[in-house]
Regions:
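Terminal, non-globular segments
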Residues: 171-174, 178
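Short amphipathic alpha-helix segments
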Residues: 138-156
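Short glycine-/aliphatic-rich beta-strand segments at the starts of folded cytosolic domains
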Residues: 125-143
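Active-site beta-strand/loop microenvironment that shapes enzyme catalytic pockets
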Residues: 78-123
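A common structural junction motif
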Residues: 46-49, 154-159, 186-194
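Short amphipathic alpha-helices in soluble, non-transmembrane regions
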Residues: 147-153, 180-189
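C-terminal regulatory domains involved in ligand/effector binding and gene-expression control
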Residues: 1-73, 178, 183, 194-212
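Positively charged, aromatic-enriched nucleic acid-contacting surfaces
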Residues: 61, 71-88, 163-165
């Protein structure tokens, strides 16, 4: 399967400029119905706000956005660009604006809606959905850190570490990295340790350092 990126969880932000408050929300969604339910909930919660601008982007290529009364092109599209730059899909962003009495101009609105969306996505984090190889390797304590580093270098994640007479590292690796990891473990341990495949799984795994 092809990998893709989604928000890890719901994320929120607040951006203030000249007394206008911009409240950002980013959530993972899997359909237009889910996205529109989020929009409806935000409009209900912030019914007294001047604007509830939104955008969503789905894996099937569906893109929708609304400036909700702001000047055309100053809200929905800049928010959508945040998702595009991050390579994120199956995601919705709603930015609610409480007007502070001072006009921000086109440039100010572009900056505000972009910042609110980017900060909310950074708070949500980004996960990669792909097929992973689940594996285990038992190693002497002295080689634990090098093995852990090898997992990270190949784009994998350590899910669990078990401590006994030896250290057992339970990891998820991109399926195409399995052979390379096995070779690195053999080299690191001079052939004393081997990788044990446990199976394959499709799941979302948070990316390290995914804050924007």
């Amino acid at each position: 399967m092809d990998s893709y990126r989604i928000p890890t969880k719901s994320g929120a932000s607040e951006y203030v400029d000249k007394r206008s408050r911009f409240l950002g929300l980013v959530q993972p969604v899997s359909s237009e119905d889910e996205a529109r339910a989020v929009i409806a909930a935000c409009k209900k919660q912030y019914h007294d706000a001047r604007h509830n601008c939104w955008c969503y982007l789905l894996r099937d290529g569906t893109e929708r956005y609304s400036d909700d009364g702001e000047p055309q092109g100053t809200a929905g599209i800049p928010m959508l660009e945040v998702f595009r730059r991050a390579g994120v899909t199956n995601a919705i962003c709603v930015v609610t604006r409480y007007f502070g009495g001072v006009l921000l101009g086109t440039g100010g609105l572009l900056r505000a809606y972009t910042a609110a969306a980017a900060d909310a996505l950074a708070d949500a984090g980004i996960s990669e959905v792909r097929r992973w190889l689940a594996c285990e390797v038992s190693t002497p304590y002295a080689l634990y850190e090098p093995v852990r580093a090898a997992v990270a270098a190949l784009g994998g994640v350590v899910q669990e570490t078990q401590y006994a007479a030896a250290v057992t590292v339970c990891a998820l690796l991109p399926e195409e990295a399995g052979e390379a990891f096995a070779a690195q473990v053999r080299d690191l341990t001079a052939g004393r340790c081997a990788v044990r495949p446990v199976g394959e799984t499709e799941r979302a795994v948070p990316l390290a350092g995914s804050g924007l």
